[in-house]
Amino acid sequence: MEALTLIRPHESETKISRQADRFMPLPERLLLAISHQPENQCGQLSCKEETVDSALALLQHAFNYFEREIAGKRVLDFGCGYGQQTVAMAKAGAKYVAGLDINQKFLQRGRDLAAQHDLDGRVEFTDKLDECQLGSFDVVISQNSMEHYIQPVEILKIMKSALHPAGKLLITFGPPWFAPYGSHMQFMTRVPWINLMFGEATVMKVRQRFRNDGAMKYEEVEGGLAKMSVAKFERLVLQCGMKIQHKKYECIKGLDFLGKLPVLRELFINHVNCALVAC
């Protein structure tokens, strides 16, 4: 996704802001005190762009059998972004890979990338699935997107409709909502669980000092945040007529046994990896 512009106030604006800070509600003042300017335009420690060679690293980690799963198969890369992952899957042995995204700039970059790797005919980029493609894919991939879908039931149903009856949906995403950085606000503070310590209005108010998109709710931030907890995801899977065939819940600091604790698991599961099939 394209990075948002950071707000860099002039000295005069800073003085006015400091005066206004004195009348700021206490929760906002507390959150602001533990916040900081992002280190770069991405708001992350690094802006390094993914390459085709590294694009499958997360999927290979999440699913030990990943390359066997896609070998000789028809694969749908749901939310393909710039297409590095789509191209990488074709190079790793997939028979055909379709990259699906609504961003036309992403799709064009993906097409250019496929041409560079001489994959015309084996890789396609599109913003919608044709009727004839529904029910035709062996594997559907969704990586680091599930927590962003504001209408997750509809999205899961679309993914399911793309699979043939014996197909498999591989979903990996994180952090879920109640994880230490489930609010996705680590660009402005390294303090964990701020979505539990501060109300939504407080977090959004302080966020305005670092992002200028006008978001007043979590769902309005760039990419959207659907407050996707682990339990919510598991309910959605059942609601869509699917079941979890295999799962790997990764917890903070590698303490995966915490993922087995009722209720408390929500605080420690940092990444969700699931293989889904139709019930």
Which role does the model predict for each range below?
Residues 243-253:
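Conserved S-adenosyl-L-methionine
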Residues 105, 149-154:
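Short N-terminal helix/helix-N-cap motif within the alpha/beta-hydrolase-1
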Residues 261-279:
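Core SAM-dependent methyltransferase catalytic element
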Residues 170-200:
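Conserved class I S-adenosyl-L-methionine
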Residues 153-165:
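A short glycine-rich, Lys/Arg-flanked "PGG" loop and its adjoining helix->strand segment in the class I
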Residues 1-135, 139, 143, 226, ...:
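Conserved N-terminal segment of class I S-adenosyl-L-methionine
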Residues 183-187, 216-232:
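Acceptor-substrate binding/catalytic loop of class I
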Residues 144-148:
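Short catalytic micro-motifs in class I SAM-dependent methyltransferases
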